[in-house]
A protein has these predicted regions:
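Alpha-helical scaffold elements adjacent to nucleotide-binding pockets in ATP/GTP-utilizing enzyme cores
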Residues: 57-64, 111-118, 154-162
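Conserved catalytic-core segments of large NTP-driven translation/proteostasis enzymes
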Residues: 1, 124-191
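Conserved catalytic network of the ASCE P-loop NTPase/AAA+ motor domain
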Residues: 10-15, 35-40, 64-69, 134-136
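Conserved beta-strand/loop subsegment of P-loop NTPase cores
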Residues: 42-48, 69-82, 93-103, 114-120, ...
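Conserved alpha-helical scaffold flanking the Walker A/P-loop in AAA+ ATPase domains
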Residues: 2-11, 30-36
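Switch II (G3) loop of P-loop NTPases
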Residues: 13-33
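Short acidic, glycine/serine/threonine-rich loops at helix termini
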Residues: 33-34, 58-59, 84-90, 154
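Conserved Switch II/interswitch segment of TRAFAC-class P-loop GTPases
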Residues: 18-19, 28, 39-59, 67-85, ...
Length: 191
């Protein structure tokens, strides 16, 4: 439903059983939760504030994802906060980007490619999702606004496509076999 009209442009059938999202807070106090999440995840979405770029928690998350060889994409969030941004969540992200004024597009590209440069310093090749030439070599960055919903369909399409292409076998489930789960955090309360 969220991907809407984007699904009609895809000719390949989706075969993965679904996606489960775990939200690991970015605050420094949640280091252990991020580490456990990075260890257990089949694929990750690293949410980055486009206005702030690379922060210490971002670097930590990148290192965790590398350590556990977890494939990931970047959601470059808060694009609606660029000065002059005209939100329109009723059209595809690429059309919305084209409809922005030149200075707004330039500011977004400047922030995005500054972040790409910081990723390169950490030995990650990254590119805006529509410019990725090889998803096995480059990290896709999808500009999004969690507030307006812009870019969310594209983000879901990219993560679904990557999961289907590279993780389809590991995402298979045996509904007749035993279940398996992981506890990320336990809080003991008396009373």
């Amino acid at each position: 439903k969220t991907c809407g009209s984007l699904l009609s442009t895809v000719t390949r059938q989706h075969t993965i059983p679904g996606l489960l999202f775990l939200d690991s807070p970015g605050h420094a106090a949640f280091h252990l939760m991020r580490k456990r999440g990075g260890n257990l995840a089949d694929i990750a979405i690293l949410v980055v504030d486009s206005q702030e770029g690379m922060k210490e928690q971002t670097l930590e998350s990148l290192r965790i994802l590398r350590q556990y060889k977890t494939p990931f994409i970047v959601a470059f969030n808060k694009i609606d906060q660029f000065a002059g941004w005209r939100s329109n969540n009723n059209i595809a992200l690429m059309q919305s980007l084209k409809d922005q004024r030149d200075d707004v597009q330039h500011n977004l590209d400047t922030k995005l490619y500054t972040f790409v440069g910081k990723m390169s310093e950490e030995n990650f090749q990254a590119e805006r999702f529509d410019r990725v030439s090889d998803y096995t070599q480059q990290i896709a960055i999808v500009p999004v606004s969690a507030k307006t919903g812009e870019g969310i369909p594209e983000l879901l399409m990219v993560v679904t496509g990557l999961a289907q292409k590279y993780l389809e076998q590991s995402l298979q489930t045996d509904v007749k076999g035993p279940g398996r789960g992981s506890v990320l955090e336990v809080t003991e309360e008396s009373g």
